[in-house]
Amino acid sequence: MKKFNIKSLTLLIVLLPLIVNANNIDSHLLEQNDIAKYVAQSDTVGSFFDRFSALLNYPIVVSKQAAKKRISGEFDLSNPEEMLEKLTLLVGLIWYKDGNALYIYDSGELISKVILLENISLNYLIQYLKDANLYDHRYPIRGNISDKTFYISGPPALVELVANTATLLDKQVSSIGTDKVNFGVIKLKNTFVSDRTYNMRGEDIVIPGVATVVERLLNNGKALSNRQAQNDPMPPFNITQKVSEDSNDFSFSSVTNSSILEDVSLIAYPETNSILVKGNDQQIQIIRDIITQLDVAKRHIELSLWIIDIDKSELNNLGVNWQGTASFGDSFGASFNMSSSASISTLDGNKFIASVMALNQKKKANVVSRPVILTQENIPAIFDNNRTFYVSLVGERNSSLEHVTYGTLINVIPRFSSRGQIEMSLTIEDGTGNSQSNYNYNNENTSVLPEVGRTKISTIARVPQGKSLLIGGYTHETNSNEIVSIPFLSSIPVIGNVFKYKTSNISNIVRVFLIQPREIKESSYYNTAEYKSLISEREIQKTTQIIPSETTLLEDEKSLVSYLNY
């Protein structure tokens, strides 16, 4: 018994200092379910951030005014970045991180500055800050891209950094030498350096690349060289011609004499989407400034094209009036273009398609095609479904083979208006031919060619976000032959034909084109791998039970998520 008391007393003496020290720990860090917690009790901002600066992996610099504030409460340290955002918003602090340190200020210390650039463009400065990971989207640089003056407001560390960077870059350009020949590589990130060629019904459409645009600018818009005139989709560019001394067409505010751009050489390098520049430092800087302003990110647009044939009487019953209004039931209406020469309207495409699908079940409408094209603003999207027949032209001494192409061609060039609406330049060509597969020959042994009809629509339309564009309305006749038979009786040999009869129907069909433009943002991107498990579960449910609604119209991504979560 005495031995047990001695051992207990000895253990108590050893553990007593540890217990006392544990009660005096200042960190107040707790581990609850593997989540770090911090309890602040009227801590100053400086001492508060000092305790977990290691979690942010940045040294923290707190201003004197911000250090006067005090913080109390329990904070989750498992996500330091998220905690920093919430804390600064609640306490009234602003912060900026330049990659080396985190600067924290009181919201009242926010400063503003107007800066004038002399030699570089605003777009070049912004791109430089982004490449150096110094640009903060929370405090954007405001100003006209084509102007030399900009405004910035934010934490003092950010404003001073931007001002010093702008001054340094401006001085570097002004002190650049003009004698020494140098080389530069300018890499494009948002557009193509080489020309792109599209073929539309035998006609080549060339979208000039940045190298071609810059070359034309340096050559004062003169015609391209013979090698470039061959519509090579990826031509090399070598500019060795001198700029005319009496030309003053340059719009560079930093160029006071056109002779500065003499003897500049450019070569497009498509493999890395770069431009190689040969010239002195000032010339390279001017070319870099131009390319930076041209290399801008473009927004993506998804174009859903519906080619629909509707019975004319049913279309009238839907309430379509190309010069008035359209009504679908009692809950929907749309205003149309009142121009007498245009068959165009903007409407709710989903509701119109629902009405078309209902008519399709009655065989009063037919969705001929529904392609979906993803393009960028100011880039043409072409849909061409055509047929071609060939004709031999035989003369007395020579002969040739010619072809005629017809079908449905839709060419759309979308762009965004100042109000966020989608404006489209449209060219629609719809051609039909007779059903003759072989040519007929008359008594003179000359071929009788098939007849081809074409309808062409060319216009510019502006569509609000979420709406669709309905184009068309022209009518053509169709002849349909159908064999109607009595089941079972018509299959009896010999006498079964008695129970069959043919019917012919002549109807007027109206062809319309529905175009649904939609901007694709990064927030609209979905990782399909996340839906794999949900789809698998849905397939299992289909094999074990009957799902009430097998026909589901998915209007948008939210509907897709709801459908998968069913």
From Swiss-Prot:
Keywords: Cell outer membrane, Membrane, Plasmid, Protein transport, Signal, Translocation, Transport, Virulence. Gene3D superfamilies: 3.30.1370.120, 3.55.50.30. This is Type 3 secretion system secretin. Component of the type III secretion system (T3SS), also called injectisome, which is used to inject bacterial effector proteins into eukaryotic host cells. Forms a ring-shaped multimeric structure with an apparent central pore in the outer membrane. InterPro entries: Bact_Secretion_Sys_Channel (IPR050810), NolW-like (IPR005644), NolW-like_sf (IPR038591), T2SS/T3SS_dom (IPR004846), T2SS_GspD_CS (IPR004845), T3S_SPI-1_N0 (IPR049034), T3SS_OM_pore_YscC (IPR003522). GO terms for biological process: protein secretion by the type III secretion system. GO terms for cellular component: cell outer membrane; type II protein secretion system complex; type III protein secretion system complex. The core secretion machinery of the T3SS is composed of approximately 20 different proteins, including cytoplasmic components, a base, an export apparatus and a needle. This subunit is part of the base, which anchors the injectisome in the bacterial cell envelope. Forms a stable homooligomeric complex. Belongs to the bacterial secretin family. T3SS SctC subfamily. Residues 1-22 form the signal peptide. It is found in: Cell outer membrane. It comes from Shigella sonnei. The gene is sctC. Its main location: membrane. Pfam families: Secretin, Secretin_N, T3S_SPI-1_N0.
